């Protein structure tokens, strides 16, 4: 079987298989701080490492219009820092809570009952008790082509400045 992207239904497939083909697909639980010092925490299913030397990662933000930015993207572009928290099984419920549609400035750490731990190299806190976290400074933002409905994705690339790993997973 061969078909064009986003034409999976015409090929008889009920769901787009791209997300299942490129697997495993880790969740990047992105913590960021706005220029007003508000803290945001949100999960992103399009996240991955890009290189190890220099250490770089990316996450991709879905937008419904060219004029609406999600809080994580807004914060990273304002302050230039973010933390990629790696979600452990113990954090699944909290991660789901943090994916809620909260107003800008609401702290998802508080909504989800999570501990904020100071980072080593940046001002954005990481989630306490995660298996690992990557402290990052913003490197570049890429605006991918928009779809026919005007939505699309914006890719945020960061340089890793410090790596936290829970001793229990080493």
Segment roles from a protein language model:
Residues 1-170:
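Basic, polyanion-binding surface patches
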């Amino acid at each position: 079987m061969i078909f064009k992207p986003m034409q999976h239904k015409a090929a008889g497939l009920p769901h787009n298989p791209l997300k299942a083909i490129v697997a495993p697909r880790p969740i990047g639980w992105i913590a960021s701080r706005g220029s007003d010092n508000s803290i945001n925490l949100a999960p992103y299913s399009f996240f991955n490492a890009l290189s190890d030397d220099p250490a770089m990662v990316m996450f991709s933000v879905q937008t419904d219009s060219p004029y609406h930015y999600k809080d994580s993207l807004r914060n990273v572009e304002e302050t230039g820092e973010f933390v990629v928290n790696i979600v452990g099984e113990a954090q699944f419920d909290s991660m789901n809570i943090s994916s809620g549609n909260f107003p800008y400035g609401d702290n998802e750490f508080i909504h989800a009952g999570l501990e904020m731990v100071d980072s080593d190299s940046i001002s954005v806190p990481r989630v306490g008790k995660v298996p690992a976290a990557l402290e990052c400074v913003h490197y570049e933002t890429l605006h991918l082509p928009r779809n026919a409905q005007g939505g699309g994705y914006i890719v945020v690339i960061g340089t890793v400045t410090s790596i936290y790993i829970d001793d229990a997973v080493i």
